[in-house]
Curated annotation (Swiss-Prot):
The keyword Lyase does not apply. Pfam families: THF_DHG_CYH, THF_DHG_CYH_C. It comes from the Bacteria. Homodimer. Keywords: Amino-acid biosynthesis, Histidine biosynthesis, Hydrolase, Methionine biosynthesis, Multifunctional enzyme, NADP, One-carbon metabolism, Oxidoreductase, Purine biosynthesis. Catalyzes the oxidation of 5,10-methylenetetrahydrofolate to 5,10-methenyltetrahydrofolate and then the hydrolysis of 5,10-methenyltetrahydrofolate to 10-formyltetrahydrofolate. SUPFAM superfamilies: Aminoacid dehydrogenase-like, N-terminal domain, NAD(P)-binding Rossmann-fold domains. It catalyses: (6R)-5,10-methylene-5,6,7,8-tetrahydrofolate + NADP(+) = (6R)-5,10-methenyltetrahydrofolate + NADPH; (6R)-5,10-methenyltetrahydrofolate + H2O = (6R)-10-formyltetrahydrofolate + H(+). GO terms for biological process: L-histidine biosynthetic process; methionine biosynthetic process; purine nucleotide biosynthetic process; tetrahydrofolate interconversion. InterPro entries: Aminoacid_DH-like_N_sf, NAD(P)-bd_dom_sf, THF_DH/CycHdrlase, THF_DH/CycHdrlase_cat_dom, THF_DH/CycHdrlase_CS, THF_DH/CycHdrlase_NAD-bd_dom. This is Bifunctional protein FolD. The lineage of its organism: Bacteria, Bacillati, Mycoplasmatota, Mycoplasmoidales, Metamycoplasmataceae.
Amino acid sequence: MIILDGKKLSQKDTIFLKEKVNQFKIKPVFTIVQVGNLFSSNKYIKTKMDKALEIGVVSRLIKIPESISEKDLISIIEEESKISHGLIVQLPLPLQFDQSKILNSVPITKDIDGLSEKNSKNLYSGKSCIQPATARGIIDLIKEYNFTIKDKKVYVIGESNLVGKPIKELFKQAGAIVKSFNINTGIKGSEEADILIVAAGHPNLVKPENVKNNSIVIDVGINSIGENDKMIVTGDVDFSNVKTKVKAISPVPGGVGPMTVISLFKNLIEIFEKYLLDDN
């Protein structure tokens, strides 16, 4: 059984990106817009800021109080985009905001998360687009271990617009036979997948009976269980019991998470290189 080590691969990619950035006369500018002060968001933001520092890009954090109006928030995003090469809005947003509307205020040329509707439209129509970071990270992780995607049954548990659907689309474009499951209607049939990707947001949802022998399981879930100093992070897969049945599995933490972060910076560098070409 192989552990799909996203942390190890992301470090290899970090070295590659750092070497690229060192060759630039000016440095890419990466901006995070955060509304509120959610504890879990602060943790994820620190990870991204640390990675930016490691790679050598300029990082900026714009913290905004929850009391801001939607109109003013959009204005800030539009202004910050003008002085950034890549910008993300840290999710989740407070409930009073229209998440789609806020994400769509990020210009498509700066949308390194790949979550705006304009970028999604290009993705689903097969046009040139920024690959959504999580989906890109998963494909890169599977390819690193030389597993075949073409003609394989790739099933996705979870149908969210931000994660599940983009994952399904990218694997479809890579030549896989794709299928998705909505957890509200059950996951019966998931045990037929050659590659099972779980992005449901439900801890330990997938048990050994839900996976095929010698299959590949990718756990996208990040669930915090417990309180304060006793809090642990677990995925959507019952890792300790499923790992004995499969060919390869990604752990939580240390699997998809680091790959999502490094994919943001891959997208940033690609956007920045286009900017340099257009500027010449």
